[in-house]
Amino acid sequence: MFNDQLLAGRRILVTGGGTGLGKSMAARFLQLGAEVHICGRRKIVCDETATELMGEYGGRVVSHGVDIRNAMAVDEMIETIWTEGPLTDLINNAAGNFISRSEELSPRGFDAVANIVMHGTFYVTHAVGRRWIAAKLPGNVVSITVTWVRNGSPYVVPSAMSKSAIHAMTMSLAVEWGKHGIRLNTIAPGEIPTEGMSKRIKPGDEAGARTRAQNPMGRVGTMEELQNLAVFLISGGCDWINGETIAMDGAQALAMGGNFYQLRDWSDADWNQARDSIKAQNEKDRAARG
């Protein structure tokens, strides 16, 4: 679909690029000739991903260990990248989410999502954007959001609020920074099964089963479809698209309203089982991080 050197000369940062959707997009950018930077809290994971991708596709992938909730750490990472030259594109992919009845949310649980998704995304966008403006350079920002930025969603309120903030940031900065040649858009994908999503958003479900049963197209999304849309948005083939949120979900949001409405029918036992599953996964992840 795309010329093999479409992104040659581009330097792209993908947040949360060590796993899942971020890793997939990073791989495609690398295949198309870009120099790719990936970041995440667990540098060892990013290091392993960088080695894997370069071994498979060649090119250059640089890994960075950073907690994007820390504005100073973010700025230091961006400054380090800039010492070799400016970025041309930013992919805001890092996120966190889990299902919960809102009355059972703790402030800590809310902050765990909001600090990554809302604060972290702004910190990275601000650190990159102000450098583009100072250097009089154009740039592209593509953020990964969700379809429920337009209508909200029960049981994922921290994510709905935080992703809606990215949606608002995208529209606001598209207007403010457009005169500098900086474009901002978001992709709102439906279900593309990943390990992290299945364990905290749909614990106990077979990956993709609920979406296949409800989606007008009868299937989940694919990594390739996300890759293609991300490449298109930064490729230069659509330079007048700015401030948009593009849904890619097989019309599921139009048909169903949201991904989690059916959880209204869950019993207390269902919620207890989900909470125990999420808690066990959190403990497993903490142990893996040491």
Regions found by a protein language model. Name each.
Residues 178, 183, 241-243:
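Short, small/polar-rich loop/turn modules that mediate ligand/substrate recognition or access, typified
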Residues 101-114, 211:
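Substrate-binding pocket helix/loop in short-chain dehydrogenase/reductase
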Residues 105, 152-161, 172, 197-200, ...:
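Active-site loop-to-helix junction immediately N-terminal to the catalytic Tyr of the SDR YXXXK motif
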Residues 51, 179, 189-214, 256-290:
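A glycine/serine/threonine-rich, flexible loop-to-helix segment
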Residues 125, 162, 170:
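Active-site helix of classical SDR
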Residues 186, 206-241, 248-250, 277-290:
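C-terminal helical subdomain
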Residues 11, 16-20:
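Conserved glycine-rich cofactor-binding loop
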